[in-house]
């Protein structure tokens, strides 16, 4: 009688500890996007990489059947995949990573901060318009929460200032 009980406890612990860890393994950038972030070291161009990555998530969210040109696919890799909530979380994380890169550049007094910030804010304004149209397509609470967080992060970017 002890064996089945111990087995059940072990199984429950394994499953409950394993699932959250699995959920955290998702990377917000594709392999090609990561390569571009590593390769492009000039601040304003690196921010453009993050903008492109964020735009790709919005493209898939707005049009799940979206296609890209062969040239785009060679450069950026396949379009990102995932649930609506995952793509929105990826979008938010991309913005947060870009903000971190801007903060790092600020600490180094990078002369390109105003240019990079201007590009970032303008892109976030355009993305906000598209994000706001997605609410009608969201059916689950998890999706609505992810959308709300993505919108909040984009709004934060639009208010950003070079210090």
Model-derived segments and their meaning:
Residues 7-18:
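Bacterial N-terminal signal peptides
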Residues 1-5:
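Positively charged n-region of N-terminal signal peptides that target proteins for export
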């Amino acid at each position: 009688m002890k064996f089945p009980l111990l087995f059940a406890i072990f199984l429950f612990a394994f499953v409950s500890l394993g699932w959250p860890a699995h959920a955290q393994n998702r990377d917000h950038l594709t392999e090609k996007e990561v390569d571009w972030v590593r390769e492009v070291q000039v601040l304003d161009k690196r921010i453009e990489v993050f903008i492109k990555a964020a735009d790709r998530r919005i493209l898939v969210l707005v049009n799940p059947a979206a296609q890209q040109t062969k040239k785009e696919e060679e450069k950026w890799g396949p379009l990102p995949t995932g649930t609506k909530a995952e793509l929105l979380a990826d979008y938010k994380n991309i913005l947060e990573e870009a903000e971190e890169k801007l903060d790092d550049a600020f600490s180094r007094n990078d002369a390109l901060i105003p240019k990079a910030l201007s590009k970032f804010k303008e892109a976030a304004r355009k993305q906000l318009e598209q994000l706001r149209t997605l609410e009608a397509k969201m059916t689950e609470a998890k999706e609505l929460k992810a959308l709300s967080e993505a919108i909040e992060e984009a709004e934060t970017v639009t208010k950003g200032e070079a210090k």
